[in-house]
Amino acid sequence: PQFGLLVTHNEAISIADYYTVKGENGKPEFRPTAHYAYHPCNSAVVSLDEMFGNAGSKPRKTHVLHPEEILDGADELGVLLYGHKKNAYWFGSTLHVEEAVKLAPLQNATGLQVTSAVLAGMVWALENPKSGIVESDEMDFRRCLEIQKPYLGTLKGHFTDWTPLSGRPGLFAEDIDTSDPWQFRNVLVH
């Protein structure tokens, strides 16, 4: 399980749009829910807690870490597809800081994985000049992944029996839906 922050992200909207099934009347009969969740490093989480504990006021003094200050760790970037017959499948990449610095000395693992997508988009645009402006979902994912692979670290996929109900309820009663583990209220942490 991962405790993450839900963040607005274009793919969370475009993926849901792409897989929406409309009925004869044009209204959606099925629309999947797509979330973008992010969990910053522990120091950043503490900083966010302090900021929100201070009514959301930005601290007077801030410090952005430079790549040489990040000594250890990895960035895991992936997708969890859930709610199907095999329960859930995670596919993603793990890029360790040491590997990121070897590939691009002034980068970190998170930055390198993100900028690899920008590079793939630029190459795709150069190779498809007549396509115009498109959503990232409309690009050839195989070609993009081919460009990105050297910058993503280890790519893995595996099935899991984990659900948001695993280990719940805990010490206190919760408002959870035990009939369907993948309901949104089971994902939220209150």
Regions found by a protein language model. Give the residues of each.
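C-terminal catalytic/substrate-binding lobe primarily of soluble NAD(P)-dependent oxidoreductases
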Residues: 1-190
